[in-house]
Amino acid sequence: MTTEKRQILVTAALPYANGPIHLGHMVEHIQADIWVRFQRLKGNDCLFICGEDAHGTAIMITAQKQGLPPEALVAKMHKEHARDLGGFLIEYDNFYTTHSPENRELAELIYTRLKDKGDIFAKTISQAYDPVKEIFLPDRFIRGTCPRCGAKDQYGDVCEVCGATYSPTELIDPVSALSGAKPIEKNSEHFFFSLNRYTQLLKKWIDAGHLQPQVANKLKEWFSEDLKPWDISRDAPYFGFEIPHAANKYFYVWLDAPIGYMASLKNLSKQRPSVNFDAYWKEGSQTELYHFVGKDIVYFHALFWPAMLSGAGFRLPTTIYVHGYLTVNGQKMSKSRGTFITAHHYLDHLSPEYLRYYYAAKLSAQVEDIDLNLDDFIQRVNADLIGKYVNLASRCAGFITKNFGGKLANELPEPDLYESFLQTEQTITDYYESLNYSKAVRVIMSLADRANQYIDAKKPWALAKEINQEAQVQAVCTQGLNLFKILTTYLKPILPVTAKKVEQFLNCDELNFANLKTPLLDHSVNPFEPLMQRLLPETAAQLTHE
């Protein structure tokens, strides 16, 4: 019986074009990429898109400091971000930008539809203004004490401690991040989206299981009070899209940023005629849509975004997967401690697959922070990847190449052992599907232990010295390499480059779940070449030194 292919669209949150990608960002991109590669390995059609988050005052001010037009800064950061994501083997079908004609068109379309429904209204508000820089201050350029929990040094729109969102005027003891001056209040007409009109729709959507339970419970707390209208406009000077028929007013970056997911697919559909934009975004679509985001942007993705989509006549996400933050050696990343590690700096020193594996070994379906402990990182890479996984192949390959001209035996000596490895497929695929990568890794490494125990028990190195044991040596090593083939298939979403090397070594078709069950018998393999290098402490130490 053939199962129908799933049609899936996956997005990761757009990196902001204001600075380099760091290892904290990579948690999400790696988590999403592993899931996408797993889906493709299962034979599903899975598109993976992202792009540059290109708008906002922060971009404008950074560009001014660098003596660049904002467009030039965005183009530069887009190139750097694409390089770093590619370096970590993140395989997007399209890595686009929100500063695009497609995004402008879609943002205007959604805004117009919401306005025509009566969901947009104008209101004069009192707004923070920097009297020194003579500019209305965006939320992120005001720092102060959170009005909800009292945490100090928080942004003007969202508290990183308790997750509350608020208006900058509610912040306690605010100061301008640009000049240090105390902001003054200045009136300005802004446009608002009536989020409260979508309260019942959002409650129903959240109750329907589209979010992890932790996230759903957190969102339900915000319904204890009426949902407030959302300010979707900003005053000039601003880098972004002008609001139609509203002079000197621009869409707030958080309005057009998630629309960037749609724009990236729209752009991809122009490159690839087989990609049908409406199939993924039209109301009532039977395709699947998954957003991977950090816990700091849940409010925007799980309340504003579904409400906007619904109001504008588009489909809602199937699931929003939320992850926690990254700490390094148990603490928040810090430039002064040398633990603010950029993706580019990491790639200058270490293999991306080491970090892909380490993150996978830590990630679960829970919204938990994960810690990059450098000592544990070294130990995991060397013990698991080198000591268990790669070691299995290197123990067997030499005998096959040297003694048998690269030819595997024509049958498995222990078919039951092989079958027992196959029987874990459902468990492992369930763990991948549910984002419980750490559990999948534990099962895979326990299989690697069993495979190595088999080789330890059979001792092909001793058999090779005995008379008339050639067939037994060939059989044992054939068994070992076929178990290694299964392990490689299971690890392929995490270690795509290594898997490709293994396919070349085994001289076989691309490994996937469809051909998992078929052992390589009476088959010629190529000479074995080292798949990975042991991670030395002095090499890993370079991560925390510029």
Swiss-Prot record:
Its EC number is 6.1.1.10. Pfam families: Anticodon_3, tRNA-synt_1g. Coiled coil: none annotated. It is found in: Cytoplasm. It catalyses: tRNA(Met) + L-methionine + ATP = L-methionyl-tRNA(Met) + AMP + diphosphate. Zn(2+) binds at C146, C149, C159, C162. Binds 1 zinc ion per subunit. It is an enzyme of class 6 (ligase). The keyword Cytoplasm applies. This is Methionine--tRNA ligase. The gene is metG.
